[in-house]
Swiss-Prot record:
Protein name: ATP-dependent protease subunit HslV
Subunit record text: A double ring-shaped homohexamer of HslV is capped on each side by a ring-shaped HslU homohexamer. The assembly of the HslU/HslV complex is dependent on binding of ATP.
Primary location class: cytoplasm
A GO molecular-function descriptor: metal ion binding
Catalytic reaction list: ATP-dependent cleavage of peptide bonds with broad specificity
Domain of life: Bacteria
PROSITE patterns the UniProt entry points to: PROTEASOME_BETA_2
Classification via InterPro entries: ATP-dep_Prtase_HsIV_su (IPR022281), Ntn_hydrolases_N (IPR029055), Proteasome_sua/b (IPR001353), Proteasome_suB-type (IPR023333)
The organism of origin for this protein: Bradyrhizobium diazoefficiens (strain JCM 10833 / BCRC 13528 / IAM 13628 / NBRC 14792 / USDA 110)
One Pfam family linked to the record: Proteasome
Catalytic-site annotation from UniProt: 14
Length: 186
């Protein structure tokens, strides 16, 4: 476990994965919420549509913190309609400089028809290599599985589902109760 994960007992508790392939972008996440070594909830929805439904997102980290960030991102999307990258950069600036937001412990993956991004509390706004990125405690396992499946004939949703299953086989903080959201790409 990373040092940043030790500061909040709810930090380690999910896997979120995005894959962009074949005219579709998909974000999937498991439903497990753990505090320490105890599973508190197995069917949490950590992936959802944002804005006017033209952006999808998923979060890893403290749930209340993530919902605060989703609300802030939705406000930025209203301010910059159709400009996910601009909205994400503006949120990242606020996240990094605002005293209250700086303490929030969460990461987000967001995507629209054109771009997929990871947002972190350190002000990073990252676009994935090859259209694949993952966050959370099982993120590295899901990412490796998705990269291995990317060159197959499987579609984006199948890759996300299979990769999250593989992560659940390895990571004790990830389960198989998966939520998926997708959008057609431009």
């Amino acid at each position: 476990m990373q040092d940043s994960q030790k500061s909040s007992p709810g930090w380690h508790g999910t896997t979120i994965l995005t894959v962009r392939k074949g005219g579709k972008v998909v974000i999937g996440g498991d439903g497990q919420v753990s505090i320490g070594q105890t599973v508190i909830k197995s069917n949490a929805k950590k992936v959802r549509k944002l804005g006017r439904g033209d952006v999808i997102g998923g979060f890893a980290g403290a749930t209340a913190d993530a919902f605060t960030l989703f609300e802030r991102l939705e406000a930025k999307l209203e301010q910059y309609p159709g400009q996910l990258t601009r909205a994400a950069v503006e949120l990242a600036k606020d996240w990094r400089t605002d005293r209250y937001l700086r303490r929030l412990e969460a990461m987000m993956i967001v995507a629209d028809k054109d771009v997929s991004l990871v947002l972190t509390g350190t002000g990073d706004v990252l676009e994935p290599e090859a259209g694949v990125m993952a966050i959370g405690s099982g993120g590295n396992y899901a990412l490796a599985a998705a990269r291995a499946l990317l060159d197959t004939d499987k579609d984006a949703e199948t890759i996300v589902r299979r990769s999250l299953d593989i992560a659940a086989d390895i990571c004790v903080y990830t389960n198989r109760n998966v939520t998926i959201e997708s959008l057609a790409t431009g």
